[in-house]
Amino acid sequence: MWVATQDLPRSAAHPFYTRLNQILDAADFDRYAEALCQRFYADDVGRPGLAPGRYFRLLLLGYFEGLDSERGIAWRAEDSLSIRSFLGLELHEGPPDHSTVSRTRRLIDLETHQAMFTWVLHRLADAGLVKGKTIGIDATTLEANAALRSIVRRDTGETYDEFLTRLAQASGIETPTREDLARIDRKRKHKGSNDDWTHPHDPDAKITKMKDGRTHLAHKAEHAVDLETGAVVAVTVQDADEGDTTTSIETLIDAAEKIETVVPDGDGLEEVVGDKGYHSNQALVDLEAVGVRSYVSEPDRGRRNWTKNPKARDAVYRNRRRIRGARGKGLLRQRGERLERPFAHLYETGRMRRVHLRGHDNILKRVLLHAGALNLGLLMRQLIGIGTPRSLQDRAIALLRCIWSLIRLPDTLWDAISRLYRPSTSLGDVLTLRDDRRLDFSVPTAFTTGC
């Protein structure tokens, strides 16, 4: 059956994605992506693959649409005509299948995803949204796509139930019941050690206590954020059982390199702001050694003996003086605002709190483009006042409510005035206005600042 072109379904392109595409096209986004990914594609062998520019746009959609899986991204691309326009799909072209997106992600290496993240930082630096002087650092846990019941012993390869059964039989219980296994498990110490247990399909996932108190296999995502603008300048994914003072080394090195790349005329990284988890003697000494001032909250460790470590004493005391000053207090307050916001946008509304991929490299590829989309949202907010498509929808709803309130205003006023002037029961009385009667504006209206 033939269908005329004018009879095919059409939709007005989403204004947010239209403006975003204009920004990407003006900076040769597709040409840059194709040049980076050329070595991963054969010239004339096999089926045509997913275009690099289209692939990276699909990953950007994960943040803008709040989609946590590649399957969900593919479904959304198939469902929306405006997103098809953003992806550059013609009417006769079908959107890529989720397996095509996954295969392309595995094909393109991590360094290329890092380069695309840096490309976005260049666009922010051109707009003055990357200063690079003061960096805040913080981390969060991402729930792994792996179940605790599937972990195995590192030495023997036994599953958890097989290991408990062997312990029960060694203690004299030949056929242990579930209650016996549970009792033996409760009495054991160090039952959740990452030194003894691993997941066979995701060795990078570590047994970790989540922020809500649950114990789960997880990964650790760490951000470095420009505290002057809120731009994410570096993202790393590391072992969830590593301490903050250990993982911060890789993140700060990555942040310093990216700042030097995108702001070559600047002074580079000068200040680091962190919470109590990043406070240690060696961490403060290392920061001073490279000429970086620290503003790190200090936990209460009581009286300390500095006789054998005067260098650490000086670093700790200088950090303490800085955080007690006016600038230090201001930076620590700013850290709570500028650092927590990306975590909320990326992992709560961005739906990446639980990952569907396995392995640090695969997860980091998604998180890098997720953070890149957040940075593009900052640029869009500077240019048009909104940072996500949903923000535009909220403004449209507020505007419609204001219009509806204005339409209803005459009826509302008439009803109020009618209640003020009420006929007297006596025929000789005239209409009177009682002193205690007031205009009643209790009718629900939608006067908001969204007007």
Which stretches of residues belong to each language-model region?
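Glycine- and acidic
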Residues: R39-D43, Y55-G62, V232-Q238, G268, ...
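Polybasic low-complexity intrinsically disordered regions
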Residues: A51, W75-E78, L87-V292, S297-P299, ...
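Helix-centered, glycine/charged polyanion-binding patches within enzymatic domains
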Residues: S171-E174, G277-D361, G387, C451
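Basic, amphipathic alpha-helical segments enriched in Lys/Arg and hydrophobic/aromatic residues
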Residues: D239-T245, K329-L427, R434-D436, T445-C451
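Short, charged amphipathic recognition helices of the HTH superfamily
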Residues: L67-A77
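Basic, short loop/linker segments at the boundary and entry of helix-turn-helix/winged-helix-like folds
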Residues: R10-L60, E65
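Conserved, non-catalytic sequence blocks in retroelement Pol enzymes and Pol-derived host proteins
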Residues: R47-G49, L110, N362
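Generic start-of-chain signal for non-secretory N-termini
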Residues: M1-A12
